[in-house]
Amino acid sequence: MESEVQKKRILSGIQPSGDLTLGSYLGAIRNWAALADEYDCYYMMADMHTITVRQVPAELRRHTLVQLAAYIASGLDPEKNVLFVQSHVPAHAQLGWVLDCYTMFGELSRMTQFKDKSAKNADNINAGLFTYPALMAADILLYQADLVPVGGDQKQHVEICRDIATRFNGLYGDTFKLPDPYIPKVGARIMSLTTPTSKMSKSDKDQNGCVYMLEKPEDILRKFKKAMTDSDACVRFDPENKPGVSNLMQIYSVATGRDYATIEAEFAGQGYGSFKTAVGESVVELLRPIREETERLLADKSYLESVYRAGAEKAAYVANRTLSKVYKKVGFLAR
């Protein structure tokens, strides 16, 4: 018990806005599964963030449940990790509003993700999209997280979280722990198969560029065989000049555990066809047990329900302690 208390805490989550991608698995979930013994881990289905873009309600519910099943199938043991749905813990919305009042307009205006999402959703530039970083800060600060596993493109959100926490602490005394980003060196940023200069994303209009965790093996192989490479016909790791090949090498390296020098030697003198097939097959085999276990878990709705209810209870216990402290410091009258 003593050692558990001293563990550093981790908080992260993924939006259930669609099917989980290979990028989500290799860049995030796979790494999370290895952290439970060393850290006190909280992982959420970030459904509140998801509605900044219009969703089909029934699909959002389905994706949330599938994501929970995929988390577990990927090795996130509910006995070792707190797995919960963001909207099941009201403190997220409650602290989110308080932090809105301590977040400056200029800070939010500079966020690159707001600019990117606004450009993609010009007909729905809502306030939630703009204040997204304050809610994300609430997600992190509620749990007094030490570390936040994020992709390199989300480091800015952790930085603004630290700024908000520092501002609040400066006004009211130590309230929030300042989190640090945790960015894994390998598999941190998996790129699109068709546009390897862009991150693999479920919102990509060209679905051939995105591989899904629960996709059929034949579809995964087809996408890898069509993956963009170059005219050089040489398997060599060079992200600047050979982004497509380098992306495939990174995927193959993470899937097989082989380093880049070994991969280059393995495919020396061969064309890209055999290389792309090998990458596709390695991904199929990597994801096969996860897909099968996810399907098994989805057939046991009562078990999944017990997991997310227990997770919400554990998460709320920690979150409400932080929220009570915040409410007292800002001057809210206790109930």
Task: Describe the residue ranges of each PLM region.
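A generic secondary-structure signal for well-formed alpha-helical elements
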Residues: 68, 75, 103-106, 145, ...
